[in-house]
């Protein structure tokens, strides 16, 4: 199956393209799709592609495949994106503001999905066989995500020469990604009456000491293939107390460790335990390895040239790691601004949507 036709088509004008991208993004934002509830948006995307004459199939478990699904005689490129969002923060449905879309998922990553859909519907001539991969539950821990199992089921996808994940990057090629551990850190003291604190051993004090030491450690910066990654561990939640007049004997923190792409999961776990276990007990909830930048891939240079900007390291975990685990080299490039992802005022500009389309169209064209 070919991802794009070889029949010449008339390119749409920039104003028309921009309007369609904005309308498409708002349309997608207005379909609620919090992780685990992607059925409506999945059905909508399939219907839109079928109506536009794009070969598409429901691959099960909130996954859809359009265009090419395995390598043919030409190089094989995948465009990939997730359909789900984090929970709403009084920012749904979306709205048009100025020259862009404001609303849940606009940046991460319904703007990117809108670009994917418009590229697929254009069916423009290409130097590649192009496939489109859409999936759900990306915002959940990787063990619950849909992409990894899809790559196991649809082995032809693993023949791709490059996968481009349209995560928010502000239209810069961001290569590689950090590994990601979430863990529960439990601090144990001795409960007591708040009127006699000298008879207790406050777990809050123990937690503050441990978290303070963890946060005092400077990020560890590492250059890989010319790109700088920062390894860092932070506490993202702290819970303690059973009553207002009881000094707690137990406190719990959630620790998030973003680790070097060079580390395997076991090495990262040992490093986090070394940092934490002098103060409390650590229980891992999830551990997902990162991915190294595919700088030697010739398609990387082609995409960078199309973007017109120097590449950056991806200071986050993204599905490029799942592609890498399946043997597919992958990079991130999308219209959203990563600084706006998951924010209450999340948004994406019309200019960024158009620029993302132009970069990918230039990369894919003959």
Across the structure, where does each feature detected by a protein language model lie?
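A non-catalytic alpha/beta surface segment that caps or lines the substrate-entry region
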Residues: 27, 33-73
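Short, surface-exposed alpha-helical segments at coil->helix boundaries
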Residues: 39-43, 113, 266-270
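Buried hydrophobic packing segments
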Residues: 45, 113-123, 150, 207-210, ...
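Metal-dependent amide/peptide-bond hydrolase catalytic core
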Residues: 2, 16, 168, 175-176, ...
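N-terminal capping segment at the start of a domain
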Residues: 9-39
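Acidic-glycine-rich active-site phosphate/pyrophosphate-binding loop
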Residues: 84-97, 160, 175-186, 331
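Active-site metal-coordination/substrate-binding segment of hydrolases
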Residues: 74-134
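Acidic/histidine-rich catalytic neighborhood of metal-dependent amide-processing enzymes
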Residues: 114-182
């Amino acid at each position: 199956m070919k991802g794009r036709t070889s029949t010449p088509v008339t390119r749409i004008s920039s104003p028309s393209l921009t309007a369609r991208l904005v309308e498409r993004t708002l349309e997608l934002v207005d379909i609620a799709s919090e992780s685990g509830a992607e059925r409506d948006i999945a059905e909508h995307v399939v219907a839109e592609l079928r109506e536009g004459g794009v070969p598409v199939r429901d691959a099960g478990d909130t996954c859809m495949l359009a265009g090419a699904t395995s390598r043919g005689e030409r190089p094989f490129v995948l465009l990939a994106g997730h359909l789900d969002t984090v929970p709403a923060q009084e920012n749904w449905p979306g709205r048009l503001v100025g020259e862009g879309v404001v609303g849940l998922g606009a940046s991460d990553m319904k703007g990117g999905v809108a670009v994917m859909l418009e590229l697929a519907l254009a069916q423009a001539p290409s130097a590649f066989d192009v496939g489109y991969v859409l999936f759900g539950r990306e915002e959940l821990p990787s063990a619950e995500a849909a992409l990894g199992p899809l790559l196991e089921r649809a082995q032809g996808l693993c023949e791709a020469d490059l996968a481009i994940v349209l995560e928010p990057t502000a239209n810069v090629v961001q290569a590689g990604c950090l590994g990601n551990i979430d863990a529960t850190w439990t601090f144990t003291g001795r409960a007591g009456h708040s009127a006699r604190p000298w008879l207790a051993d406050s777990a809050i004090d123990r937690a503050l000491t441990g978290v303070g030491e963890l946060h005092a450690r400077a990020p560890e910066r590492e250059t890989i293939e010319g790109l700088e990654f920062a390894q860092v561990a932070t506490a993202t939640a702290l819970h303690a107390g059973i009553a207002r007049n009881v000094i707690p004997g137990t406190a719990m923190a959630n620790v998030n460790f973003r680790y070097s792409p060079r580390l395997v999961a076991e090495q990262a776990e040992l490093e986090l335990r070394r940092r934490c276990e002098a103060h409390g007990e650590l229980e891992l909830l999830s551990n997902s390895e990162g991915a190294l930048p595919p700088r030697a891939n010739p398609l990387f240079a082609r995409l960078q040239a199309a973007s017109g900007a120097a590449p950056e390291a991806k200071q986050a975990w993204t599905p490029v790691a799942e592609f890498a685990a399946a043997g597919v080299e992958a990079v991130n490039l999308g219209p959203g601004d990563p600084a706006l992802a998951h924010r209450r005022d999340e948004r994406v500009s019309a200019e960024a949507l158009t620029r993302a389309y132009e970069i990918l169209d230039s990369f894919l064209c003959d």
